[in-house]
Amino acid sequence: MAKKSMVAKWKRGSKYKVRKYNRCHICGRPRAVYREFGLCRVCFRKLASEGKLPGVKKASW
């Protein structure tokens, strides 16, 4: 989990528009964030397995 201070800092916005930091919208994790969904791999997997992400299904071949 991200530190509460980092999440608060991220939600507040930045001084410059160039400073964009990809974080998970749910937990605030800074790494392994899917841009298309705005979620980290952990939250993505959890929501996808629960069926809460439309158009996402488990791969099988």
Swiss-Prot record:
GO BP terms in the entry: translation
Alphabetical keyword list: Metal-binding, Ribonucleoprotein, Ribosomal protein, RNA-binding, rRNA-binding, Zinc
SUPFAM superfamilies reported for this sequence: Glucocorticoid receptor-like (DNA-binding domain)
InterPro entries: Ribosomal_uS14, Ribosomal_uS14_bact, Ribosomal_uS14_CS, Ribosomal_uS14_sf
Cofactor(s) essential for the protein: Zn(2+)
Entry's Gene Ontology cellular component terms: cytoplasm; small ribosomal subunit
NCBIfam families attached to this UniProt entry: PRK08061.1
Protein family according to the UniProt entry: Belongs to the universal ribosomal protein uS14 family. Zinc-binding uS14 subfamily.
Function in brief: Binds 16S rRNA, required for the assembly of 30S particles and may also be responsible for determining the conformation of the 16S rRNA at the A site.
UniProt name for this protein: Small ribosomal subunit protein uS14
Species in which this protein is naturally found: Kosmotoga olearia (strain ATCC BAA-1733 / DSM 21960 / TBF 19.5.1)
Phylogenetic classification of the source organism: Bacteria, Thermotogati, Thermotogota, Thermotogae, Kosmotogales
